[in-house]
């Protein structure tokens, strides 16, 4: 049984140079792929007790939400969003963290779907509740201490998925301090896809994006961004390319930039 989930959410300006999270539920209500439910990262799939937005929720919370969406044993899930693709890959990555592998990303998302004049709907699906058996996997989420060790030992490639301007400290939203985690490299999630269709670039082009910054499929790779969203897009592609030791720094710059003792660079 296939479940289709619209994973759209929004990062909105907060008026102070930062961003705030906004659910994409109203966007889903207005139009979605026929048969698609809405997976609400903001209200259902983030740890409300955490200091930073979008943090991985407790296993019980995640399992309850997925069960309510009709996702469980014997189901396959197709994920998409209406913006950058990173909301869909974030939920794909969380499913992976909790041991569910029958999840797929709709290449190009709703943007490409609409470019191709495919049908849209405003009707909610009637997926029956499922039983989601979470089997948490270690090593797919990194924390601050691991990232700090990684930039000191040099054996791990730490990749910033934010824009080039943000990486250099020249513009875009910042998280208290401009720039990047010291000694990290930059593969913007936005550069992984075609600017017209929003479909991913070819496997060869994607592989070159990562190899050009020193990523090695034989070594550990940690992707980060502002709050673990764009980073999941990099992590998704790395996984498709055969990298087997990839993690997302969950709190990312929301945590790192807020701590003045942690090293950062600009330029």
Each model region followed by its residue ranges:
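Cytosolic catalytic domains that perform sulfur/thiol-centered chemistry
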Residues: 1-267
């Amino acid at each position: 049984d296939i479940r289709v989930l619209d994973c759209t959410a929004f990062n909105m300006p907060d008026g102070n140079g930062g961003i705030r999270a906004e659910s994409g539920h109203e966007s889903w209500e207005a139009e979605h792929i026929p048969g698609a439910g809405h997976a609400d990262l903001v209200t259902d799939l983030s740890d409300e007790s955490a200091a930073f937005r979008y943090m991985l929720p407790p296993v019980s919370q995640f399992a309850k939400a997925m069960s309510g969406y009709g996702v469980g044993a014997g189901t396959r899930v197709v994920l998409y969003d209406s913006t950058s693709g990173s909301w869909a890959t974030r939920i794909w990555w969380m499913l992976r963290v909790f041991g569910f592998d029958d999840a797929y990303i709709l290449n190009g998302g709703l943007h490409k779907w609409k470019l191709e004049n495919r049908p849209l709907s405003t009707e909610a699906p009637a997926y029956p509740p499922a039983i989601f058996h979470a089997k948490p996997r270690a090593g797919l989420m990194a924390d601050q201490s691991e990232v700090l060790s990684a930039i000191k030992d040099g054996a791990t490639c730490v990749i910033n998925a934010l824009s080039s301007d943000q990486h250099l400290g020249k513009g875009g939203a910042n998280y208290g301090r401009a720039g990047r985690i010291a000694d990290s490299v930059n593969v913007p999630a936005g550069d992984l896809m075609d600017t017209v269709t929003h479909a991913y670039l070819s496997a060869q082009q994607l592989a070159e994006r990562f190899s050009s910054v020193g990523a090695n499929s034989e070594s550990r790779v940690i992707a980060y961004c502002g709050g673990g969203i764009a980073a999941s897009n990099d992590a998704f592609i790395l996984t498709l390319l055969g990298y087997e030791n990839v993690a997302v720094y969950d709190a990312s710059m929301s945590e790192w930039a807020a701590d003045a003792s942690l090293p950062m660079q600009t330029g």
